[in-house]
Design a protein with these regions (language model features):
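Beta-propeller domains with acidic blade repeats across secreted/periplasmic ectodomains
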Residues: 1-170
Length: 170
């Protein structure tokens, strides 16, 4: 979040709130790893696990691959237990159009064969027309073996916080 010219009371309140939450300024485009080395619930170690990303949001670890949901797509990186730095350039799994609701939540299927990625709409109420909303406001199902993707759910303004129902797995 980078504030532009503030012209309304709402704008002033929003900027003040974002500053208080330390959310003012450009994204550092990195993922920081915090480790609790002695098990006391406090992270003693801090490492930049991965940088050079594009507004990373969602993360999933499946079979030695660390998946990152960037605003412009999903990228896979090799990962081994204990790693504190990933230097591989990564392998793009799929591309998304950026802008609009930029969060990209990720969720692995229980069997680890598929990855689900939430992509928000460009606007709030389709006020820029529906053509610009194509491929948005949905959850994609990504096949990790083939790289194929299909729309799993649609009509969702900004699908964030994907999860499986713990009892049924649905």
């Amino acid at each position: 979040f980078e504030p532009g010219p503030v012209k309304t009371l709402f704008g002033h309140a929003m900027v003040a709130t974002m500053r208080r939450a330390a959310a003012v300024g450009p994204s550092p485009n990195r993922i920081t790893l915090l480790r609790d080395a002695d098990g006391d619930g406090i992270a003693e170690q801090r490492h930049v696990l991965l940088d050079g990303l594009q507004q990373p949001f969602g993360m999933a670890l499946v079979d030695g691959q660390f998946y990152v949901g960037n605003t412009d797509g999903v990228v896979a990186f090799p990962y081994a237990d204990g790693d504190t730095r990933i230097t591989s350039p990564g392998r793009p799994l799929c591309k998304f159009r950026s802008n609009g609701h930029w969060t990209r939540s990720l969720l692995a299927s229980p069997d680890g064969r598929k990855l689900y990625a939430g992509v928000g709409s460009l606007s709030n109420i389709g006020d820029m027309g529906m053509d610009v909303e194509q491929g948005r406001a949905c959850v994609y199902e990504l096949d990790l073996a083939t790289g194929e993707r299909r729309t799993f759910a649609s009509g969702l303004r900004n699908p964030v916080g994907l999860a499986w129902e713990p009892t049924t797995g649905a």
